[in-house]
């Protein structure tokens, strides 16, 4: 924990024999409490039974402004859990620290007066006189680049695959390491790159995106490094490159797998030496950039085929992050769909009906979030009222279907009046479709625009099989 760099050794540094001399033992609780109170980030001190012994003003203000936290369990105050985090499906830094005997760091979704917030937690054990941990200190820093609510900016999600990805973003962002984002098309790689930038010390400078797939071999060098006046035909003025524009900030190389092989050598030199030359110049310039790259291509296969340099790959892939496809982010469609609909339908204020949401949640979305966005934009254009219903989603699916694909499903039956539970609506809809269908399940899946496996999974989940 960085804030304990200067003071923690006075509490916990062991002597050469392993024992803690009197001057290095844990100091009295009042002194620890006074130290925590002066820290700007939320901190708590608690024992091995998760009981909070002390908290600073920043913690009380963020998590429990109306009620004392002393004597309460940390998981109760921060998470509203009745059991420790690791018993509720989340990582528990205390449990991890007990196993490792070291400092631990995790990402949690905490409850605050403002609602749920993603929080980076760093836990440090403080040894007692016997050398064993006597207390634990947690430092909490909100991660502002992601949210679990649909009306928030930035990354949106709360599924476990999303949280695992977000934990990697939170871990690498404060460093200067190169990041390689890997994932299918439409998974939001540019949004994740922006999150890495905004959570980094370079957030005050520019994030410059380079679409590598749109640059020809002749344009790549002049766009990236810039050129001098007269360097080539048409170069009527000196032009700084994108590397220079990103100085002090982050250079985002989107679709890095599409960089021509001859240009990969020049990019490698930039990454290895931190220097470059404008086209037509002999002056060596220094690049102050952090590189985040992204691709949907299989770089391992490209390296095996000789289409991507292995040395460049290892320069870019200091810290790889795999972005989960939408089909693996169970529950996130319910968060993403309202947020995307609000953006694509503006200035109209459209709502999604429960039946429309149920239909969206059984779609496979091979195009991921981008496909979901396009589908919602079509549905909004097909809707004349204020509510996008399942019929609008069905029509949007049908009109967006590529030639040769299966026809759209028949209109969904209207749900019973007064039914508001989303799972019940989904069950009623599928039950009616299954009852009305006389052919094979594979045909029904095709008519719904989903795979047979997805249909069987939904039927099992809803106990309709």
Q: Which role fits each region the language model picked out?
A:
Residues 168-234, 244-260, 325-330, 375:
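Conserved post-Walker A coupling segment in P-loop NTPases
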Residues 67-109:
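Terminal output helix/cap of sensory domains in signal transduction proteins
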Residues 23-61, 174:
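Sensory modules in modular signal-transduction proteins
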Residues 125-164:
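Sensory coupling linkers of modular signal transduction proteins
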Residues 105-109, 118-122, 137:
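PAS/PAC sensory module
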Residues 1-27, 59-62, 111, 127, ...:
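Bacterial C-terminal helix-turn-helix
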Residues 64, 202-205, 280-290, 298-404, ...:
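Nucleotide-binding/hydrolysis machinery
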Residues 238-248, 252, 260-266, 277-296, ...:
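AAA+/SF3 P-loop NTPase mechanochemical coupling elements
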